[in-house]
Amino acid sequence: MSFTKFCRGCGQTLQSANESATGYIKPLKLSGIFSKGSVSNLLKKNLDEQAIFNNAFKNLNPQIKKHFPNTTSFPFHEKEIGRTDLLWCQRCHDLKFHSRIRPKELLQEPQTTLPDIISTVNNDKSTCLIIQVIDVTEVIFQDFVSATQYTHFPVFHLFTHADVLPPKKPYWLFPGLGISSKYAMLYTSHSFNLVDKLLGRINPLLCSRGHVYVVGEANSGKSTLLKTLAKRGNGVFNELLLDSFLPGTTQAIKGYPTQYFGSCFKQLSEGLIFDTPGYRGNLKSLLPWVDTKLLTSLVPKTRSRNKQLTSKPVQYRVRFGQSIILGGLVRVTPFEINEDGNHEVGKPIMFKKEDPSSTTIHFLFSTLKNKKTKGNTNNMKPLLIKLFTKLPAHITSITKLQSLENSTKNDNVPLVTHSPSPMHSSFTVSIKPTQLSENVFDPTSSGELVIHNFGFLSFSASRPMNLLVESVNPKAVSWRSAKPVVPKFNK
């Protein structure tokens, strides 16, 4: 008897021939599964591995521990032996249970496009509904593309992260995008009432033995939506899906029976729900080189600047030419510029005689307090910073940003505001060491990059130098550099 071999996380077909290819799994796991005589040995091996995992899990930092389920990673019961749909490939297993990510995986950007996904859906004659998941914070009217342009199947548009919109419902959104409110809805996974409302809207569109495809850009919330539906219906999908804010986590189209979602899809008896890879959007992914041990810690937990100044901030060393990522979408890269202080954006950096790997810059990240959000309970949740090269549809005014500029004009600390370049989606700021006297400079160079309404990044260099800081520059917010206002780094 043969079994379908695919990863329960990313959906790729499991293989043990090429370690660098997707879906790789150690040969020992596959060879033991199909041998009846090795069932007892495999169970013992799983028990041993689970014991090791449990011991390691107990020693994790509580702040990191809450992001990972305390569950087994291999088939545990004898009746499940031989079911390879319960296995993880090496990549997904390392990401889910050990927070290990290989640099080459971080540098992958989504290559799939919306037409590519829809062409696969159109070839499935059993398709009854397409749910297009759109992050409402990334909606740009002139760039929005509906899946209805590529298919004759019904498309329901689900706009996620609606909790960041103004209190009044934006009735202008759907007409502005040219879609009917009958097939569109604002949604946030934090409300079960909206989950029930969503099910009430899509269930009439379903048919028995039909297929439902969930499509959307990378990190738009497709997997989170499916997990929320399973949780609402008392299903088991929450246990089977990989959860990560990294782009490209779902690497292949994968179907799940309606039983995984409990009582959610009543009209879809014996049908399938398909999770699809995130397609490439207008804003492309920004991916870093970052110590994976700090991958979770780099997401700030509070917007209160006062709390962060009295607590220990996140501190990280970055070599010149490397990047760090903030909240998943903002990249900041320090560069050393020539002695004459000139560097052309886009040109390669010519390092000095010193070994660049021996010179590091310290980065400290904190967030600013937002006075307008005192009653917002989401303030206590991790803040994912999202910045844009174009103004999102829900940001209609920059009055708050201008008033913030005016309020800082009389500050004792000199501030410099940098305007975005119309030719580039990034800009540069030059940080020079303080000159104490003629030919004598402060032994350290430090500064601060302020992101209005979002946060600030403090940095300190180990010797006098000029630094070039490159970052994505959104038109929705302004940036400025300043002298550091946070405590100095510990030597």
Curated annotation (Swiss-Prot):
PANTHER family: GENETIC INTERACTOR OF PROHIBITINS 3, MITOCHONDRIAL (PTHR46434:SF1)
SUPFAM superfamilies noted in UniProt: P-loop containing nucleoside triphosphate hydrolases
InterPro entries in alphabetical order: GTP-bd, Mito_lipid_metab_GTPase, P-loop_NTPase
Lineage, broadest ranks: Eukaryota, Fungi, Dikarya, Ascomycota, Taphrinomycotina
Any one cellular-component term (Gene Ontology): cytoplasm
Any GO molecular function: GTP binding
Alphabetized Pfam families for the sequence: MMR_HSR1 (PF01926)
One GO-annotated biological process of the protein: mitochondrial ribosome assembly
Protein name: Uncharacterized protein C2F7.09c
